Amino acid sequence: MNKVLIITYYWPPSGGAGVQRWLKFAKFLPEKGWEPVILTVDPEYAAYPAIDSSLVKELPENISVHKTPATDWFRIYSSDKSKVPSAGFAANPQNSLKGKISRFVRGNFFIPDPRKGWNKFAFRKACDLIEKEKIVTIVTTSPPHSTQLIGLKLKKKYPGIKWIADLRDPWTDIYYYDQFYPTCISRKIDSGYERKVLKRADRIISVGSLLKELFAGKLPDIRNKIDVIPNGYDEADFKDIQPAELSGFTITYVGTLSDRYPLTGFLDAITELRKIRDFSLRFVGKYPDSIMEQIKRSGSDEKVEFITYAPHSEAISYMVNSSLLLLIIPEAGDNKLIITGKSLNINSELLPVAFTQEKLSM
């Protein structure tokens, strides 16, 4: 069986959306004749936005997982380790002077991101695995986009290796990029990294056709080496979940919420809904105080439940046991590039969905 080295920062016990894609690929790759070899960061050194220890149980039996230390650059500009940013943390920026300084430091002194503190450790271990395991194919998946620089360096050392760069999100075009206050020099450096990765990778994977077009427009003659492999869902995640008898009409949102997510139209709609029927509203995921205040101002706080974080299986259970699922996309000029993974799980359940962007009609 051919071996493929998968270099990924997010791996169980990391929680959140970023871990799901390659956890599932690693499960199914052996069916296609590929043995995955995982290289990831040791959780003791990692800066994860969330922990989901239940995902450890989903690891394929006998899978080879190699972990290395990392330098935790987040400690340098964040005194509160409990508030480790997720990939989209700037979507809910702290507008205090301290928050703005923190984001400026992040955007101009840690390019492309602070998780690059893992790179030197990962590179050394990757070289060891490539040589000992006779690996000729590697995959780097991002965000964090600093992981792609590991592949860039490996390709330089081993020109004959096949390097596949999996880009789940935009890089310098991500909707919250400007909230790091990057200088012209910082933008140039970061864009340079992005173009080098796009140019030197043997194949590029994106999660959607619009994202493919975005990357294809960065350089001439790279379109033909960009493939689209969408996210999906695993039927096994649903087989042991039995829908319960609902006591009333339940609306559920699962995932991140921030001030960039347009809730006004939805809250206006449920204000009208309250006049004609009883209902309950449930948010499962991280949310700032401002969201709570917005809901309180709408008069809906008596019927709302906030669950700060739930393991993946529990989050799916909340979705299954709902009357209506809410899907919200952040307000941004390029939000068409946002392909939320939860939409695949929503589709798998064939439940009614209320979608909000700027306005919601129910």
Tell me the role of every PLM-derived stretch:
Residues 261, 311-318, 325-347, 352-362:
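Nucleotide-sugar-dependent
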Residues 244-261, 267-268:
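Conserved donor-binding/catalytic core segment of Leloir-type glycosyltransferases
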Residues 41-120, 129:
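A conserved catalytic-core segment of Leloir-type glycosyltransferases
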Residues 94-96, 110, 122, 126-147, ...:
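Short N-terminal targeting/anchoring amphipathic segment
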Residues 210, 229-232:
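Carbohydrate-associated surface elements
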Residues 285, 290-316:
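Nucleotide-activated donor-binding/catalytic signature segment of Leloir-type glycosyltransferases, i.e.
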Residues 32, 124, 146-149, 153-157, ...:
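Membrane-proximal helix-turn-helix segments that form the acceptor-binding/catalytic region
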